UniProtKB/Swiss-Prot annotation:
One Pfam family, short name: Rib_5-P_isom_A
Name of the top EC class for this enzyme: isomerase
Pathway this chain belongs to: Carbohydrate degradation; pentose phosphate pathway; D-ribose 5-phosphate from D-ribulose 5-phosphate (non-oxidative stage): step 1/1
Catalytic activity annotation: aldehydo-D-ribose 5-phosphate = D-ribulose 5-phosphate
Name of the protein this chain belongs to: Ribose-5-phosphate isomerase A
Residue positions of the active site: 104
Keyword Disulfide bond: no
Subunit structure: Homodimer.
SUPFAM superfamilies (alphabetical): D-ribose-5-phosphate isomerase (RpiA), lid domain, NagB/RpiA/CoA transferase-like
Amino acid sequence: MEALKKIAGVTAAQYVTDGMTIGLGTGSTAYYFVEEIGRRVKQEGLQVVGVTTSSVTSKQAEGLGIPLKSIDDIDSIDLTVDGADEVDKDFNGIKGGGAALLMEKIVATPTKEYIWVVDASKMVEHLGAFKLPVEVVQYGADRLFRVFEKAGYKPSFRMKGDSRLVTDMQNYIIDLDLGCIKDPVAFGHLLDGTVGVVEHGLFNGMVDKVIVASKDGVTVLEAPKAS
């Protein structure tokens, strides 16, 4: 499995060329993309500027010598490569297993070409078997938890050891065990309109390419362009 993740990450790095501003994703597959960019910067003299999606990725990129800028200092990003926890046939996805969903979505938004790198196990018929992360402000989080519970979403607070995980943005994450999300777009809108929810892990209609690594090789899936 780790070998497949590496193949997907390295394949995505081939889309990066000199002079690009690139979004550097978070997670076990995006890790290999960042490593390959670091190698190319060092060995090939690749000239890029990175924008990171988490403190973990910032630390990795700095260690590799990749020049970085804040999201606040750029207007657009040429290419962002990130992982995904699930991807359905309509190119909707669940992200946030690494607790970086808010920063990931902020970086994805001004991106001209958004690529996900996954192994074949992440491709699903319907989203929802992977718990949907919902980032919430700390104030009122327990009340919101009860609202989700009453709605039948089977919520659980993301934990780190014995205490609630706190994201880079100082929020909590409530994971929803939904089983199957029949209409990801409608459910995304529902969460968008829920007071106290900062962001959720449904990335609907955002991705341009999905690079899928399997034992049979690498497949690049292109999302249909919006008319």
